[in-house]
């Protein structure tokens, strides 16, 4: 079972009300973001669909990307259309189903940016394990991020490792319970400069489906 796909797409994004009018660094003169995206991908399933893998290469060319930059006509920061972007990269993934209960997966992405994009990492690697038996399910995974731009003006980058875990129990067809832990290694990191992300956090809840 092998599949090859080629795709070309054109897209745009209008600036949001928040970006234009709400709170600094708002800017009512923002223009829509526009881009062309080209992708070529290959995927295959083997061993009675227990093993799957894929590879994807892409090229993105766009203009008017909205980012936060120093105000050229005053102090502070201002949302601005930054001009053109030209990025390309590759993504790879693999997964294996040991049995109906256990499975593993991993993926890696590499991004080259001619013009750096805020909150976009150059390298991202993830590995995870999934468990599902009866009414119980659980998963855990570790993600490594390298070269994530948090401030384009200072070309500031972040590197960090995140470990997450979650589990759930389906009591009935309508009721389930879940728990989740994020950033269990309590990493100190930022996605946007000046806004530290939470350290280890835990949550739980109930889902009711009608």
Where are each of the predicted segments found?
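Predominantly the C-terminal beta-signal and adjacent terminal strand-loop region
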Residues: 183-202
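A generic beta-sheet turn/junction motif
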Residues: 10, 44-48, 131-135, 171, ...
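Outer-membrane beta-barrel signature, preferentially recognizing the C-terminal barrel domain
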Residues: 1-3, 7-62, 69-97, 119-122, ...
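One-face residue pattern on beta-strands with alternating periodicity enriched for small/polar residues
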Residues: 164-168, 176-180, 203-207
């Amino acid at each position: 079972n092998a599949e090859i796909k080629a795709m070309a797409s054109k897209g745009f994004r209008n600036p949001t009300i928040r970006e234009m009018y709400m709170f600094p660094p708002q800017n009512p003169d923002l223009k829509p973001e526009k881009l062309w995206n080209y992708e070529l991908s290959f995927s295959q399933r083997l061993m009675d669909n227990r093993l799957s893998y894929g590879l994807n290469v892409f090229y993105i060319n766009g203009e008017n990307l909205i980012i936060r930059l120093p105000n050229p006509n005053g102090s502070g920061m201002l949302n601005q259309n930054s001009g053109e972007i030209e990025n390309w990269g590759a993504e790879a993934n693999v997964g294996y189903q040991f049995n109906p209960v256990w499975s593993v997966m991993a993926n890696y992405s590499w991004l080259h940016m001619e013009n750096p994009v805020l909150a976009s990492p150059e390298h991202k690697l993830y590995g995870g394990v999934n468990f599902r038996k009866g009414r119980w399910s659980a998963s855990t995974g570790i993600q490594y991020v390298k070269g994530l731009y948090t401030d384009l003006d200072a070309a500031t980058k972040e590197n960090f490792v995140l470990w997450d875990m979650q589990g759930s129990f389906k009591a009935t067809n309508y009721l389930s319970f879940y728990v989740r832990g994020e950033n269990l290694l309590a990493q100190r990191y930022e996605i946007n400069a000046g806004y530290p992300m939470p350290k280890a956090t835990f949550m739980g809840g109930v889902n009711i489906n009608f």
